Amino acid sequence: MKKNKLKYVVIPAFAAAALFPVLANDNQVKANDDKAVSSSNISKPESTNGKSASALNTNNANETTPTSSLNLNNDVKPTPIESDEVVKPKVPFTIAEYKQKSALELAQLIREKKVTSTELVDLAYKVIAEENPKLNAVLTTENGKIPKALVDEAYRTAKEIDNRISAGKLAANPVDWKAQPFLGVPTLIKGLDELKNGDYTKGVYLNKGKIADKSGPVATEFAKLGFVILGQTNTPELGTRNITDSKLFGPAGNPWDPSRNTGGSSGGSAGAVASGMVPIASGSDAGGSIRIPSSWTGLIGLKPTGHVVKFPLVKTIEDAKAYFEKTGLIEPKTFIEPPKDLKKLKIAYTLKTPLKDLELSEVAKKAILQTVDFLRKEGFTVEEVKEFPIDGYEGIKTYTVGAIGEEGYVTAVKGVTEENKRQLDPATYALGTSSYMGPNANTDISSVKPLSTFIDQMNAFYKKYDLFLVPTNAVTAPSNDKKIDPYVDPEVEEQLYNINKITDPKERFKLLTKQWLPMTRRSPYTWVFNLSGNPAISLPTYLSDKNLPFGVMFAAKNNSEKILLEIGQYFQDKHQFKMNPAIRSTNVSENGNKIGINEDGTKFEYAVPTYAPSVAELPTLDINNGTATIPSKSENSKTTSVKEEKKVLNTNKLNSISKTLPNTGESTNNFLSAIGLSFLALIGLLKRKKNN
């Protein structure tokens, strides 16, 4: 019987942090794991004219502080609890309460008219003004302010929402809470996505001052769901790194320790949520860009099915479920429903990495073993596998071929000279320069495994197991001091800037693959599930002895997002999450409500709403016999049995979600990218034909 042929797509080397996480050499990764420097070492890079290069330069006077009555320079810091007395929330709504609540909780308060969207926008801008100078999570102009056009639009949107709610059914555009579950909630958009009147440099220094004239798919979708967009978040250049730092924007400080990085490439969004600026912020993931920073900042990070995807960083599973249910950025498809009893799921875990010579840090091992112990005590079946299913070194080669000819790199190096080439990230310059030579000019492409190899390997693994548990990263968050934690080896960096002088194609390709290794050794797992397309979720379950958050990751077969979200719900309900106490209290009252803290130290109690999907009766799936009870199907949410999974995996090949790169919005259908992947596709088809 002939096998189904799988499509091939370009996997951009950027767009996620990370296609390939990069650091120093192998010894540095372990030795520097718990080193950090003082926050005074975090500074925005200087441009050639001596001015800060990290700021968004709008080239006009179109910038201001938020137009609210709040004093944005007034420090508000919670004091220690002095009493066990629980009191009602203070009026007006406080910063401490705002930071504690999820997006759905804030939307519920708006719906109940206990607070207005405008008041929440006031509070959000105040927290940004307080936290951003030390974290550099939000993009600002050269004098440290969010562009006036974005601030004005945020207040205009919030006021319009308040008026609609006040008018009720008499409003010209009455509120539909089912369609807009996040109505009035402040948020931030990742800096690589287009936001009208916002930064459109993609972190490239040579693009400094470029402003978007329209909003892209992510900002449009967030507005459709009811969010009020306040501004944009920091990212690395073109999203290439697994940390957030660039010559234009500078490093992002981690709220747990500002001398450390948040991770990348959605690091600014992670810092914004983890510090309480907003309860939710957009992210994108082509190699770990959602999950890596979620792990290092103590958040929840879901990567849906697909190679290149978009999803927000959140602090509650309910917010993730609501977004997953309502977003139009996830293509409607057949999703596998979780079993009625989650303990029927068979879980595998490993302490081995895709890079077979890489040893995990003690923190990573402890995080996994603690999770395994918890699951077994809860009655789950958990088995250890002694070898990772995919060869990471082979996978890196495939990723590199996809990166050569990628449009983002090609565009970035246009017009670059010997004099200004070092204003680009060395990876950007090397991959962009190599793109003009074409993939075949850089390596013998027949020696690179096609994408289908890794998809088939993981599909085989999931025939035996339902979930795969691994550390999200190999180590804790790196330092922002590049002398301690460089993300590219200095010797390799120099070679990358002179790659045009390397005449041997094989040597060029070897250099391009080598430059990823320091990053992949820090984050060896995340990008594998982009390669295979499998969904995965990072959960904030562990704190190191230095009080640094560390996430564990569950991956599953394609279209198992609902199973991953229910596993996350189980961990959340069992109080396994370790988050910044300022944004999510772990204290629970006798009646199950959360307990927060006001600025004066008094406590307040609040209930956590449960998000209910639009489908009233969710189907149940018996994993053991592969049968399902299927109710009437909604448009966007279907169900399937295990017996149908093979058909699902074959029909759900590479869907339209990978036609647009989430970090740049660039089309992958360009000529240079097509050359490299055409060769890979041809090789894959020939090999399959030979085996039939």
Language model feature labels by segment:
Residues 647-651, 655-690:
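A cross-kingdom C-terminal cell-surface attachment/processing module
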Residues 90, 94-280:
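Gly/Ser-rich catalytic/binding loops embedded in alpha/beta enzyme cores
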Residues 63-177, 326-523, 531, 573-601, ...:
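Amidase signature
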Residues 271-348, 558:
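Fold-level recognition of mixed alpha/beta catalytic cores in primary-metabolism enzymes, strongest
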Residues 3-9, 669-671:
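Bacterial N-terminal signal peptides that target proteins for export
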Residues 7-15, 675:
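Sec-dependent N-terminal signal peptides
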Residues 229-230, 279-283, 468-470, 537-538:
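Paired acidic/hydrophobic, glycine-rich loop segments that form the ligand-binding mouth/hinge
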Residues 24-91, 617, 629, 633-655:
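Low-complexity, acidic Ser/Thr/Pro-rich repeat tracts that form intrinsically disordered stalk/linker regions
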